[in-house]
Design a protein with these regions (language model features):
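Signature of the SF2 helicase/ATPase Hel1-core->accessory helical subdomain module
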Residues: 6, 12, 34, 39-42, ...
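Conserved lysine of the Walker
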Residues: 2-3
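Conserved P-loop NTPase motor core
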Residues: 8-9, 49
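A substrate-engagement module of RecA-like helicase motors
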Residues: 17-151, 215, 219-226
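Residue-level marker of positions within ordered structural domains that often coincide
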Residues: 11-12, 62
Length: 267
């Protein structure tokens, strides 16, 4: 009931969008975003017999960049067998997706190679109009253009909070509806908190450790670079020693921290 009520108001405002800007609707869950965008908005627009221009938008790293993806699979030497198996569902999914939202591709996430996503998702600095238009483009740029033609913009709380912190991503708007508002404070806490722990730091170090399985891809790239610039492999070995020493120092530091504070916070 309440969903239709605020969407009714949003659609009534659509005739004044040039003067007042679009209506932004923020949700906490992907389920509600999908329900609003794919079911409720079309149903209400048909009932009211009014045209609707709506866009559903998420954070940039949720969208695949076809340029980066093409470049990654073009050089098979940088991928191991498990990497290629994980990317097969993505290749099939690209033939039918209209949004480029990688969360649609459950086969990729079932592969447990989710760190590969950072190698093909849309990225600031890389995904420019000049590069992406030359290589069949990427979905994120198309969505950004559609934002400025939309009457209604459906976002998640994370994106709304990003806009509040660093304005300019969304077009100017004067009306915002926050659905699932009881989750807004929690979303803000998760977004703006600064967190540090041993597990997270160790995981980051593993990403640059040449001896770790997650480093196989860039190890293969270094092997190719070494053929052109001998000596690079020696630097890799030095990095491996440095990471090992840092991991040891991290464990010692965290143990000392626990010893000094365990009785203070756990009497």
């Amino acid at each position: 009931g309440k969903t239709m009520a605020y969407l009714f108001g949003a659609l009534k405002r659509s005739s004044h969008v040039e003067q007042e800007g679009p209506t932004v609707v923020s949700c906490h869950t992907k389920h509600l975003q999908d329900q609003l965008f794919y079911k409720d908005l079309p149903q209400l627009a048909e009932t009211m017999d009014v045209p609707v221009k709506a866009v559903m938008m998420k954070g940039r790293n949720n969208y695949i960049c076809k340029t980066r993806f093409d470049w990654m699979i073009a050089d098979a030497n940088t991928l191991d067998e498990k990497d290629m198996e994980a990317l097969l569902p993505v290749m099939f999914w690209l033939h039918w997706t209209k949004t480029g939202d990688i969360s649609e591709c459950s086969g990729f996430f079932n592969s447990r190679r989710t760190w590969l996503k950072s190698s093909f998702c849309s990225e600031p600095g890389f995904c420019t109009g000049e590069i992406c238009n030359r290589h069949r483009g990427c979905y994120y740029g198309q969505l950004r253009q559609a934002l400025y033609r939309a009457h209604t913009i459906v976002v998640n709380h994370s994106l709304l909070l990003t806009e509040a912190d660093r304005p300019g991503f969304l077009p100017e708007f004067n009306a915002v509806v926050v659905d699932e508002a009881h989750n807004l404070v929690k979303s803000a806490y998760n977004q703006f908190k600064v967190e540090w722990n041993e597990k997270g730091t160790s995981f980051l170090l593993q990403g640059v450790d040449p001896a770790h399985p997650r480093s196989m891809r860039w190890n293969n790239i270094l092997q190719q670079i070494n053929e052109i610039t001998p000596g690079v492999i020696q630097l890799r070995d030095e990095l491996q020693d440095a990471v090992k020493n840092t991991q040891g120092a991290l464990k010692d530091f965290m143990q000392a921290l626990r010893d000094d504070n365990e009785t203070r916070f756990n009497p």
